[in-house]
Every structure is written in C-alpha cells, then in structure tokens.
Curated annotation (Swiss-Prot):
A GO biological-process term: lipid transport
Designated gene of the protein: Mac_nsLTP
Family, as annotated: Belongs to the plant LTP family.
InterPro entries linked to this entry: Bifun_inhib/LTP/seed_sf, Bifunc_inhib/LTP/seed_store, Plant_nsLTP
Entry keywords, A to Z: Allergen, Disulfide bond, IgE-binding protein, Lipid-binding, Signal, Transport
GO molecular function, one term: IgE binding
Cysteines joined through disulfide linkages: C30-C77, C40-C54, C55-C100, C75-C114
Purpose: Plant non-specific lipid-transfer proteins transfer phospholipids as well as galactolipids across membranes. May play a role in wax or cutin deposition in the cell walls of expanding epidermal cells and certain secretory tissues.
Transport as UniProt keyword: yes
Name of the protein in question: Non-specific lipid-transfer protein
Taxonomy, superkingdom: Eukaryota
SMART domains listed in its UniProt record: AAI (SM00499)
Annotated signal peptide: 1-26
Amino acid sequence: MANSGVMKLVCLVLACMVVAAPLAEAAITCGQVVSKLAPCLTYLRSGGAVPGTCCNAVKNLNNSAKTTPDRQTACGCLKNAYNSISGINAAYAGGLPAKCGVNLPYKISPSINCATYTLSLYNF
C-alpha cells in the first residue's frame, strides 16, 4: 500500500511539473508543493493528530509562496493533488492550514478557483 501511495505521489509531482511549466513567472512549482506536503498525506486520509512534520511543511509552503503567482500556483497544485490522490478527506484537507496556524483565504477543495486569490487576501 505504501508503494502505491508513493507511486501516485511521484506521478502527481511529474504531472504538476508539466502543468506548471507555462507559469514561468511563478517561482514555486507543483513538484515543490507536493513534495513539501508529503508528510501530511497520512493525516489527510485518516485524520487524528496532525504530525509536527506536516505543520512544518504547511508553514514552509506558506512562507515559500511570497507572490500572487506563487500563491495561485500553490493553490492550483493543492487543487490538483486533492483531485488526483485517492482517499483524501475533504474536512481534513480544508481544515489543515488552520490546525497548523496558517491563515488562508480559502479552503482547499476540488472546486476552488485559484485565479481569484491574490496576495492581498492573505493575512500574515
């Protein structure tokens, strides 16, 4: 089962890299977003206590996405990951940033419109 999850994650990273290629103005890539959040996968599927490594990853990702294009790219990558990785619980995904003390102006979901999110919507 672990190998299946790892393979899906690798495939998702590769797919995100291809999708993100046209977004040259964004410094962050889908590969970076997905690999940073890999420690959160177990929580996103099963819940329970959020691992410290997961919250560190969420905070690190939030700090890495400094510009509006970066934040829109990260949002799109999160949306794609949500839709591509089986077994992710919507409530766990939507509530993860807040559980880690990160304030996002949206909840991670399969229907989010990432183009509407700009840097000014974020509270630092």
